[in-house]
């Protein structure tokens, strides 16, 4: 576990620990993990500060780190990129007021299978639907309670 930096507010260090997390994961690529879950908190935590320029820097940092990770892991892992809520994508309302709270906007969902096979996904899915695709990747049977929950068409 790599700790977040000790700063009063994250707009002072919008990159947080993203580069350290990325470097550590790349350094441990050869460990052969079955599953890796990574959370870049930058866009969320910096978004809460209301500082647009810092939020832009946070998004650029995460974009850079995801690109580096994709280039290393794309041939060995299925990759899912998503979020559980928005924040940094909408920081100013129609009246010019600063927004520091989570949004209810749709978030991206990217599934990049290492096999590059084409998979059709629902247009309107929910966070609960992500579990189904993770179970498929890990070749684990879906519990009966999840019968209606799938992001795959």
Language-model regions, residue ranges each:
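Feature captures the catalytic ectodomains and active-site-proximal regions of enzymes
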Residues: 1-153
């Amino acid at each position: 576990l790599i700790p977040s930096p000790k700063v009063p507010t994250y707009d002072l260090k919008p990159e947080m620990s993203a580069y350290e997390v990325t470097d550590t994961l790349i350094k441990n690529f050869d460990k052969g993990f079955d599953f890796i879950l990574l959370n870049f908190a930058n866009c969320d935590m910096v978004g809460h500060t209301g500082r647009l320029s810092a939020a832009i820097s946070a998004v650029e940092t995460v974009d850079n780190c995801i690109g580096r990770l994709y280039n290393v892991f794309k041939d060995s892992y299925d990759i899912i990129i998503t979020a559980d809520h928005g924040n940094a994508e909408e920081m100013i309302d129609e009246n010019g007021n600063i927004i520091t709270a989570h949004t209810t906007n749709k978030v991206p969902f990217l599934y990049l299978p290492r096999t590059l096979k084409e998979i059709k996904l629902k247009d309107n899915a929910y966070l609960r639907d992500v579990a189904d695709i993770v179970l498929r990747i890990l070749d684990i049977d879906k519990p009966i309670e999840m019968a209606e929950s799938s992001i795959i068409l």
